[in-house]
């Protein structure tokens, strides 16, 4: 066989080295879109929750009684309330308009708010009422002893206060507050979405029950449950703020009302009574009374019987002040 006739196999194709292979380019556009979506999710959630929170539908279908009645002061228009009650939870559950009206003959309304709402919204509910209704003859302000320390400079963005601001003061200051507390705003948004979409009260029973209660009592809310058997924990000790208390009195005396500032009755079993009795003696229009623990359904909430007892004491003060005012007016007329 001739060497020239031998056929050689074709050479194998050269393999591409990794350096020669076409490089896989990252899908930058897809990645950017993904990041944008991730960034927009909380923005969309917060925006949606704000729209939900501002709707009447939300109040009717969540399960918190305090949120259910939070709009009560803002619904009153041209309402004659010769005695107007404002304050914290101790006033909301502990001052009964029907009892005061029966004892004094004066139409009475209670527009007190939970402590958590006051911490953020302050006197928004009271100021709104005074703008839309005839001014009262008597303005009764009642707070638990620790609340006389005045508003906290850096209050937590809680549900009750944030909801009230969002529904009734949706201006630049409110949205600045949300913007400067992003984590708390997200928590508030999550709460609104959770209570509106997951834990929803389909029949609106909570709203109907709470609303019927405050309409029939002109603002008194009685928390469910029996009276306490013993003190659950000591009430915290906080230094009262005389300047804040004085500013409340001065601000609302300009409305022509007789302003009466009360410290709520104290559980007899709580050892901090002496601390507040001494510090508030010259600042309030009453001395701290001590009530049996059975007249409280929670530390700052009263049973119906406790509210009645407290309201009768306030009615007596109003009657005395009313007679003094009438006598003073008679002398001026003479």
Residue ranges of predicted features:
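N-terminal Lys/Arg-rich, disordered targeting/topogenic segments
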Residues: 1-32
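Hydrophobic membrane-insertion alpha-helices, especially the h-region
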Residues: 33-53
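Glycine-rich phosphate-binding "P-loop"
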Residues: 48-62, 232-240
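Short extracytoplasmic/periplasmic juxtamembrane "stem" segments immediately C-terminal to an N-terminal membrane anchor
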Residues: 62-80
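Membrane-embedded segments
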Residues: 86, 90-174
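Acidic-and-aromatic substrate-binding clefts and catalytic sites of carbohydrate-active enzymes
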Residues: 116-120, 237-239, 265-273
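Secreted/periplasmic serine-hydrolase-like ester/acetyl group-modifying domain
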Residues: 152-255, 331-334
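C-terminal regions of proteins
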Residues: 271-334
């Amino acid at each position: 066989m001739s060497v020239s006739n031998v056929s050689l196999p074709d050479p194998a194709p050269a393999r591409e080295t990794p350096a020669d292979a076409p490089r896989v380019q990252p899908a930058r556009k897809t990645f950017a879109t993904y990041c944008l979506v991730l960034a927009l999710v909380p923005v969309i959630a917060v925006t949606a929750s704000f729209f939900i929170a501002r709707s009447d539908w939300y109040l009717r279908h969540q399960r918190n009684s305090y949120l259910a009645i939070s709009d009560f002061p803002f619904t009153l228009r041209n309402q004659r309330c010769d005695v107007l009650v404002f304050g914290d939870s101790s006033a909301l559950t502990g001052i009964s308009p029907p009892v005061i009206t029966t004892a004094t003959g004066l139409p009475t309304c209670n527009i007190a708010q939970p402590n958590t709402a006051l911490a953020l919204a302050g006197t928004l509910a009271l100021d709104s009422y005074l703008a839309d209704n005839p001014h009262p003859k008597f303005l009764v302000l009642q707070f638990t002893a620790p609340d006389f320390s005045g508003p906290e400079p850096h209050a937590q963005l809680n549900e009750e206060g944030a909801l009230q601001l969002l529904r009734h003061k949706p201006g630049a200051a409110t949205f600045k507050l949300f913007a400067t507390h992003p984590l708390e705003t997200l928590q508030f948004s999550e709460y609104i979405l959770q209570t509106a979409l997951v834990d929803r009260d389909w029949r609106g029973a909570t709203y109907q029950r709470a609303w019927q209660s405050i309409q029939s009592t002109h603002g008194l809310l009685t928390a469910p449950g029996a009276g306490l058997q013993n003190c659950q924990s000591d009430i915290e000790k906080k230094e009262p703020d005389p300047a804040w208390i004085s500013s409340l009195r001065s601000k609302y005396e300009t409305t022509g009302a007789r302003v009466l500032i009360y410290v709520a009755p104290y559980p007899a079993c709580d050892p901090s009574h002496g601390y507040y009795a001494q510090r508030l003696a010259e600042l309030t229009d009453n001395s701290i009374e001590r009530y049996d623990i059975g007249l409280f359904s929670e530390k700052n909430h009263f049973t119906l019987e406790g509210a009645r007892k407290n309201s009768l004491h306030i009615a007596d003060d109003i009657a005395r002040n009313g007679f003094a005012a009438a006598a003073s007016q008679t002398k001026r007329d003479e």
